UniProtKB/Swiss-Prot annotation:
This is Protein OPG061. Belongs to the orthopoxvirus OPG058 family. Its main location: host cell. It holds the Pfam family Pox_F16. The gene is OPG061. GO terms for cellular component: host cell nucleolus.
Amino acid sequence: MKVVIVTSVASLLDASIQFQKTACRHHCNYLSMQIVKEIEEFGTINEKNLEFATWKDVIQNDEIDALVFYRVKQISISTGVLYESMMRNRTKPISMFFVRDCLAFDGDPPSFRMTSCNINAYNRNKIKDLIILMNMKTCNKKIIGEFIIDNFGSVNALLSIINSNVTWVTSVINNSNGRGINIRVSNNKMLTITSFRRFVNKLKMYKTTKCASQLDNLCTEINKMDIIDKK
């Protein structure tokens, strides 16, 4: 299956383009999809995007079997409307995959269906690394905050993954100490719940850190600009 990856950023709260690409590439690799092109957009996607040459080349190429998006929210119009607009210039149906949402839009007639969340293996390794970092006294908030953004895109995206894998995350937390070495812990249910809640609360603190960092970077870029006072 030949596919095109579509990434887009519409606000500071969106996962970075690079993170979206990483997740989509992992998804394609898992399903043995052949990536033939990657499209980067700024802003949400609608029918107007289809008017650009980059999109026309993809849509009119019947050798392209599917588009791989990071999430459904990248599209500002109905997925069905976007599909119909694309099909006006195609003779062969095209599928759409949404990696983070574990959804696919295809079939005859086309409709949404659930898919397996194939980024779990990637996320699990990164979550293990994150837990080790958080247990290291030498790692400050800035290092951990940057790790979260670089590997998960946002704190909200990370929390979504964690909340859908509570049992596994809790077992990793309870089997790791400050040096990342496995230890025996109590099987007490309350201890397990407390450990998970404490971990989640720590992660929530990085929401503020992320926004402050982004605003600082934005202010820095503005200060670098040459502002001409036109009279």
